[in-house]
Amino acid sequence: KKKKEWVLRGDTVLYVNSEDLRRALEYDLEQEKNFSYKGLSMDDVVAHIAKFVSGIWQIHPFGEGNTRTTAVFTIKYLRSIGFDVNNNLFADKSWFFRNALVRANYRNVRKGVEPDMSFLILFFKNLMMGENHELKNRYMIINAPQQSTEQADRTSTEQVPNKLTEQLTAPLLSIVKAIGIEQCSLKMIMERIELKHRPTFIANYLTPAIQNGFVTPLYPNNPKHPRQKYFLTVKGLAIFNSTK
């Protein structure tokens, strides 16, 4: 299947052959299942997710509506591994998302064009880390002026605004550091903070962290769920990244 791409000045991306679809998809999903995120920085996590999603899209398993279905799959998968994401960015920047996937999978040696993940990574930084990179389609056209990533990088949010850090008490900061980029049980967080009195931990640490929007439960409608875990919101991750 071929589709002329505006961002490639009319050229096309090669998709996986239909007879290889199942094998290619199973391979990518198995690789992801066995991948460990432990010890990775958020930048590395985002880069890995971008690469994984780009590979799924390029296999083109969904036929018509492949990009839209890839977006739905991505949202569900990110939620399953602890990220609080929704459809808003995909809806607002659907064309950018598609063009970024095209650029991530396009190679033309004769024209000197190699696959470029940078645009997709900017998209996922906005989605997963709450950053505010400028997402412009015109920057992605092959052989476009070199202002693309330079302009986008200027909006990087490596520093957390002072207002955010001013909200932090010592207990809030300690729970943010204890959770990091993981999904943690209550017991695990208490062990990392070295607290043994559960009511004190819930009253002084967990409840304020949730009320201030730094931490969210995996099962918000069922606080006593047997597999309940907690993870950082985008706001919490911003604080965590600023402390590293």
Protein language model features and the residues they cover:
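FIC/Doc superfamily catalytic core
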Residues: 1-244
